[in-house]
Amino acid sequence: MHMPWLSLAIWVPILFGVATLLLGRSERNGLARWVALLGAIVSFLITIPLILGFDGSTAAMQFVERHAWLPSINASYALGVDGLSIWFIPLTAFITVLVVMAGWEVIANKVAQYNAAFLILSGLMIGVFSVTDGFLFYIFFEATLIPMYIIVGVWGGPNRVYAAFKFFLYTLMGSLLMLLAIAYLRYSTGTFDIAAWHDYPLAMATQKLLFFAFLMAFAVKVPMWPVHTWLPDAHVEAPTGGSMVLAAIMLKLGAYGFLRFSLPIAPDASHAFAPMMITLSLIAVVYVGLVALVQKDMKKLVAYSSIAHMGFVTLGFFMFNQQGHANNVAMQGAILQMISHGFVSAAMFFCIGVMYDRVHSREIEAYGGVINTMPKFAAFFLLFTMANAGLPATSGFVGEFLVIIGATKFNFWIAAIAATTLIVGAAYSLWMYKRVVFGPVANHHVAELTDANGRELLILGLLAVAVLVMGMYPLPFTHTMDASVNELINHVAQSKLPLKP
């Protein structure tokens, strides 16, 4: 009997979250923090056997678990991971550890509830990446909204209620069509098994409707232009930990949905809609990058840069050649970009949080000369700013570079437009860094700053290691996903239109 590692990865953080919640009284804040940290670390350790035991040479689902759950509607508790999803599970658990540490001294009210929300959210997000049953996917996908809604709405900034409500409404409205699509697929195939849906022939009109239904749910989550407007508000109002999880993991749920649903279930519609998807992705990459350039609020700037970086991901998914094959290099680059963005965006939001905790302002104008008072912090901040701009040898470069290489094979002009983002990305990242960190000390707030403490340096150090290792040695990441990416590309290249009698 093999260990149910995936079930443990999902339910251990949720159970620790419930345990933390039971320590809800304020005199037990210290204990609640330690229980939450223990839960987050144990949850991360559970994901290590998944990586070590994963066989990258096959595209088959691994660590499979299947139990009857709701036999009346043929839904089962079915889990499994392949090369497309395996890395997101340790990434989620790793970011959760950092988030619990990030709120250690900063969050003073409702400490147990705050940490519990993140632990439960972590388990739910790991659930999204590891279920192979459509009904269960919908439940996990929607359930992630609730802890995030609470995190933004309770511990957020002055406009937190508006931001939380907008976030909830946007993402929920998008997902309603997905529920109809899932119900239709269950009705047509008689099962909720996602793998069976992948092989089920569908007429072109049906595929287009299904593609559109899934697009509404996933595009809002990514978020793609023009349904991205909830994201800057949510980021600006969210506490530091909330922004870290939102950017690092929650945006990936939508991109992952394209890989697991839109492309394999509706391949012919994916080809038909590819020009539209490429256009929307390029608008996100270029236009939203330019929007980031004029932001005065650091969190807004990084939020817009997140949308631009996720534009690279959707671009990499939808570049098909004449034979209908998606580009292997671009597809791998897009998935690497998802993982890298998890580290880099979490680091950027944490850096802004470190300064905000001291000065209580996110405005770029409130800073200047931070390097004089916080030299260690400024060094880490520089590394992450460079990674955000896509500097070679950082993780931010690998995915973007592969997508651009893939795009050159597909269409030179698309590659050229996509490559401009490296210039725009460097512009807004370095322009922000220059104004915040360099120059003379701007005011007495900056003069009184203290450098990052041990806890903050530990978080920055762990993220720096992740960004550099992935940037210099991406092979373990590409090796595990190779077989699964090729399998997906071959699957999407075959038409699923029913044969005419």
Where are these regions (language model features)?
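Cytoplasmic juxtamembrane regions at transmembrane-helix boundaries
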Residues: 101-117, 240, 248, 445-455
